[in-house]
Amino acid sequence: MIPSTAAAALLTLTAGVALAHPGCGGQEIGRRNVGGPMVYRRDVTDEASAAASTDVNTECTAYGYAPVTEIASSFPTIWETASILSNDTEGQQLFATINSTLNTKLPNDVPHGTPTGDWTGVNYNSSDPDCWWTHNKCTTPASDTGLEADITIVPEPMTWGLGFDDGPNCSHNALYNLLSENNQKATMFFIGSNVMDWPLQAMRAHDEGHQICVHTWSHQYMTALSNEVVFAELYYTQKAIKAVLGVTPQCWRPPYGDVDNRVRMIAQALNLTTIIWSDDTDDWAAGTDGVTEQDVTDNYQAVIDKAGNGTYTTHGPVVLNHELTNYTMSVFMTMFPKIKSAFSYIVPMCTAYNITQPYLESNVTCPNFETYISGVTNISSSTTQKDGSSSTNTSSSGSGSAAGSASATSSSDDSSSSGSASASSSSSNASSGALGMFDGLSGVGLVLSGVVAGVMLL
């Protein structure tokens, strides 16, 4: 928490460094250097071949997937701050509507600091009128804003809310194998640029029944960004996930937890529920600022110990874990047996809140809590047949729009249900307008043919 002085009406923020998880910027997970010459190429043809190896060097060797050029121009440059594209008329119109409402309802809520988390010289009212999480861990906006409270806990006792930030990670096969072997589903908070970089890994997450949420396009401090950039960071990540997986997420997690009412209002207009956390494992911080791997293990153990001391008799924790590096994934794998032993249930966030329609599309459902704990953890999707009848697929494998439709290239060229926590009349209306922005990409296989200068493996 950024320090405050109770006696001061205005607070001067002098922190010059990121106070949350500064290492969580994406480059640790095989971030590609867009624009450089390709020096590696992995021969993968589909999702299964991408999931076959647990050798990190093999997993994180770049691959190409067609048709790249057909859709690449519909998105911002990967790993650069997103902005609305000049030819994206629908995006521009949707933002104009949202921005008009925002300026009317929250005219005094303005950006804070820099996108890298530097608040030097920033003056902010110590009463926290913007419900700024980074300032005071505020998660419940004032009622007159019309904003939903952030999700921070699981309403079911002795239940661990499982999620992973920063994916998809090119080297996540070992983690996903563990989850699959234990019939364990999670909520995956995906960075848009990572989805573009590693589409087959994103497909695996969705097809194996994990809930997919938004974690912005370029992973920056959102409250430092302009209204337009906040919108673009969320909008294009939704759009990329829709293009790759065929579904439009209705949930998101702000990088570093950095959110305020202005950012919440933009997210809610895109029908995105804000999910924070109650407990941070600090897995992202190992090796920085004096944080050791033992500290991370101790943090996990502290959450586990709460299950034994009565803390979770009325609710459960939402725990911050990361699909960030091999270490952050492996430490979870090590602690998973202890978590299973200590907690009655481990569930994804859609199940925790009985949100049976986790996406804008109504043909994919998430099991509610009662169904999940009975052993039916699979995502169910329905399709309409040519004769007008419908069929239901109750396996954990969904059907993303890119799955099976895009083909690998070997060239070396350069290149909601009523239970939804996000439901509100204002966000619902805006979302109806947002639906059209995805129609043109439905059924198109999104992949990023790699231009790579090298792969950083940590």
From Swiss-Prot:
Cofactor: Co(2+)
UniProt: Co(2+) binding residues: 166, 215, 219
Ligand binding (acetate): 165, 256
Annotated segments matching region Disordered: 382-430
Annotated GO CC locations: extracellular region; plasma membrane; side of membrane
Modification(s) after translation: Glycosylated.
Applications (biotechnology): Potential vaccine candidate; elicits T-cell activation when injected in mice.
Enzyme Commission designation: 3.5.1.41
Stretch forming the signal peptide: 1-51
Positions annotated as propeptide: 428-458
Chief place of localization: secreted
Lipidation (GPI-anchor amidated serine): 427
Domain (NodB homology): residue spans on this chain: 158-348
A biological process from GO: fungal-type cell wall biogenesis
Reaction catalyzed: [(1->4)-N-acetyl-beta-D-glucosaminyl](n) + n H2O = chitosan + n acetate
GO molecular function: chitin deacetylase activity; metal ion binding
Entry's localization field: Secreted; Secreted, Cell wall; Cell membrane
Membrane topology of this protein: Lipid-anchor; GPI-anchor
PANTHER family hit by this protein: CHITIN DEACETYLASE (PTHR10587:SF98), GLYCOSYL TRANSFERASE-RELATED (PTHR10587)
Membership in a protein family: Belongs to the polysaccharide deacetylase family.
Protein name, per record: Chitin deacetylase 2
Species of origin: Cryptococcus neoformans var. neoformans serotype D (strain B-3501A) (Filobasidiella neoformans)
Organismal lineage: Eukaryota, Fungi, Dikarya, Basidiomycota, Agaricomycotina
Gene name of this polypeptide: CDA2
